[in-house]
Amino acid sequence: MSRRRFVAGVAGLAGAAVTGAFARVARAATPDRYDYIIVGAGTAGLPAAIFASQRGARVLLLDAAGDIGGTLHLSTGQMSAAGTRLQASRGIVDTPQAHYDDVMRISRNTADPILTRIAVDEAAKTFDWLMERGFEPLPEHPVLGKGHEPYSQKRYYWGADGGRSILAVLRREFEKERLAGRIDLRLQTPVSALLTDAAGAVRGVRVKSGDREQVHFGRHVLLTCGGYGSNAEMFERLSGYRAYAATGYPYSQGAGIELAVAVGGYVRGRQNYLSNFGSILTDDAIPGRFLARFVVIPQERQPWEVFVNARGERFIREDEMSVDAREHSLLSQPDLRYWIVFDEAILSAAPPGVGGWTREQMRETFGVHKWFQQADDLATLARNSGIDPEGLQRTVAEFNRGVARGKDALGRVHMPKPIAKPPFYAIRHQGHSTTATVGIAVDDRLRVIRQDGSPIPNLFAAGELLGAGQTQGRSFVGGMMVTPALSFGRILGERLPLTSHA
């Protein structure tokens, strides 16, 4: 995607106009000057503010929301770190190099090696800091993994309250610094533009507060305002896939991308898009709302059903143990969509497939919810569901032959029953992702860079704004979004030079 095309929708933020505004304000008055202006009070912005303030920096922290925390309010808060004190106390020998090797193995070497190296090298320091200040992981942690491809060593942690367990620690530390008078917090204050000088260096921000605009100047401007998961138009434009489910943080609107691109930054990472293996949504709206999820993890429930795409074809063995393999198999299916097909004998005998539902709840939903279809024959079931009838009939017949001879065409092992007794059932599953795969390009010092690799002076970025694909590649690697965001925010707060008065 060309930069010219991307910024067409935000031409009002173009560099010349913003530079002119900077010059007019500079002539008119001398506003407060901060050491740090941090745009976004979430997973990366909070540690940046805390650590900068602890050094004596004067910090302005801005957020469009009405509370600090960002996606930590919704996140599972999964972290990964190697060489932590908790690991040592439990006799677990681990290193950042082993962590790095695992990330590259799981991502098939698609994660950015520079940012990933920084993330794993800094992870233990970040995690130990949280633990020292009261973070409590679940008692059995660390673990190898859950919901994502497992690590080779136990380095995966989260708290009982998910992301809020992390936020509770950050909020306490943040309030200490705010009450000390070194952090100026402005909530419900979106940033409308970055201010640049004639040389292209970022000097401050323009904000909207109520019905009026203000400008603030600072030595370092940090963009930590998250991704674009709740901006359906930007999601499709950048990721190349539709935003099928509205399950993200409502303020993840891509504001940081617009701000950075308007002053010369660019986006990268489109090739790393990956969907999860699907959910049941409330309706056909795009984006839709989450309703439930069929248990498709064989470690939790062995499959009795078959999974078919819109052509009625199976596309992966249903008892495939690798979640990464399942997720990648869905990328090539039309609309990231598939159906879970079974019959009355399976519904009666198998453990209920929809997570948290009883068999009776499932029965009551067929014929009521559009994504739950039943019919007395496979052809009718297919037509009502949106599946090719001939394809489905052919697939079920082939599967049943495999059950009879004890050998499946795709290598599936668990095949307790054929699909033969009417009525027949189909439940639609929709793949989706709420994380921002694409993000703003930065260098090894987290400076926002132009396409020629040169840094934009005084402008930095961290968190999901960098794109999930930078530290995960084309995979979902456990803990490699939350922990890098925390660590990169901490690094920026610790290491950027301060003005002489601080």
What are these regions (language model features)?
Residues M1-L13:
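N-terminal secretory signal peptides and thylakoid transit peptides that target proteins
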Residues A119-R212, G218, A232-E233, I280-T282, ...:
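Conserved redox-cofactor binding core of oxidoreductases
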Residues A81-A119:
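Glycine-rich active-site loop/strand segments that organize a redox cofactor
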Residues I257-L259, V263-S385:
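An anion/pyrophosphate-binding glycine-rich loop and adjacent beta-alpha core
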Residues H216-D284, V482, F488-I491:
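Glycine-rich loop(s) and the adjacent beta-strand/alpha-helix scaffold that form part
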Residues P31-G42:
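Beta1/beta-strand and adjacent pyrophosphate-binding region of the FAD-binding site
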Residues G391-G473:
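A glycine-rich dinucleotide-binding beta-alpha-beta segment and adjacent secondary-structure elements
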Residues R55-L72:
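Glycine-rich FAD pyrophosphate-binding loop
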